Amino acid sequence: MASGLGRRFGGNKLMADFGGEPMIAQILRATDGLFEKRLVVTRSEEAAAYCRILSVDVLLHELPLRSDTVRLGLHAMRDTDGCLFTPADQPLLTLETVSALIRCFCEDSSAIWRPACDGEPGSPVLFPRWSYNELLTLPEGKGGGYVAARHPDRVRTLPVRDPHELMDADTPEEFAHLLSIHLNAARKDDSHEL
């Protein structure tokens, strides 16, 4: 999901430089090769062009609401057993966490799966097929969390240790904080290779 307007950020955060590449590249990497179908739903022409260069399917739209983004994306994925809604502004989400969510879903495909840190649920959220009708008919402006909240008995969480994985970069300050963590981790990785 890459359809936010970036009002609090003050611009197109998806294309903001995150360690030498657009921030959206991080979420594309975290989901690469894991799904039969992958689709970026966005209002950003720049993000759409970047995805096309990487051969990632894109649905470019101009609709204003989160419920519109969910509906458009799910409509394109309706023949799947499950659908992962991943915000594109969560740059520290890892491939390992997304892979673990998929493994959990394979063990219990009737549950709504989401990561949680210290008991606090976050995104992305993996929805099973039974929830598609509710997602397609979300109240105006609501997102998938609305469906999860309506079915708390069917929500399962995957514990993650790093709370930064679940953080959004909604403001320039949050972006700078997450970028700093990313760059420090990259430096540590580089020093281990020496």
Residue ranges and their predicted role:
Residues 123-127, 167-169:
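Short glycine- and hydrophobic/aromatic-rich loop-to-beta-strand nucleating segment
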Residues 7, 48-49, 133, 167, ...:
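Alpha-helical elements of the RecA-like P-loop NTPase motor core of helicases
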Residues 137-194:
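Conserved alpha/beta core of the MobA/IspD/sugar-nucleotide pyrophosphorylase nucleotidyltransferase superfamily
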